[in-house]
Amino acid sequence: MTASPRYWIGTSWKMNKTLAEARGFAEALRDADALRDPAIQRFIIPPFTAVREVKSILSDTSVKVGAQNMHWADQGAWTGEVSPLMLRDCNLDIVELGHSERREHFGETNETVGLKTEAAVRHGLIPLICIGETLSDRESGRAAEILSEQVVGALSKLSGSQKQAQILLAYEPVWAIGEKGIPAEPSYADARQAEIIAVAEKVLGRRIPCLYGGSVNPDNCEELISCPHIDGLFIGRSAWNVEGYLDILAKCAAKLRGDTK
């Protein structure tokens, strides 16, 4: 029996790429499938307009494909929203929830992230729950408190067997993401992720993977993936072209093959 991948490394394209551009990326990734490493689970999160096409192109690979958001309701008068049923209809695997841009610009709260997490699990989607403190949170010494509130809020609506579902966390300090983001020092990220994992374990009764995201690039990916509490990387613009993504995958795979962690 083949062991499940230990690490998750993927990218969300945010509001980028036309259908043709998305298709080109997916085809290039498919054509490079022989380079995959069994220790790494790859995933891609395109915009809604491209998810079905990307999933179709990658259907014969191990790459998981996801959506960047969803509503918690199955259907109804929610103009402009997309339901978990619709994502399942596109054969998607993952749904990204609670990104800081959703929280800041679209009124996402710990409560709504919790509702969406429960709906995702109920419909067999893997929730990738984004959490992270702002610079002011960090400077005021409230980072651990804020992160704990976000983790508990996201997971507290799960009950019974739902707590055994596949769930991913992604620690993305708000000050580290975006074009002007400052990458977190690996030691800082690892310490925060240890705290996040401990909080989630108290809620769920088991350890779940926690990825790091925030200005991940080819220069820092190897040091980050070597940290004991970093279970993968959630990459932004450094992986928006397929060459960049494949480069980071290759560097991490090589590092892990020689790693004893």
From Swiss-Prot:
GO terms assigned for molecular function: triose-phosphate isomerase activity
UniProt keyword annotations, A-Z: Carbohydrate metabolism, Isomerase
E.C. no: 5.3.1.33
Coiled-coil ranges from the UniProt annotation: none
Magnesium listed as a keyword: no
Pathway(s): Carbohydrate metabolism
Catalysed reactions, as listed in the record: L-erythrulose 1-phosphate = D-erythrulose 4-phosphate
Pfam families in alphabetical order: TIM
Family recorded in the similarity comment: Belongs to the triosephosphate isomerase family.
Name of this protein: L-erythrulose-1-phosphate isomerase
Organism whose genome encodes this protein: Rhizobium rhizogenes (strain K84 / ATCC BAA-868) (Agrobacterium radiobacter)
Gene coding for it: lerI
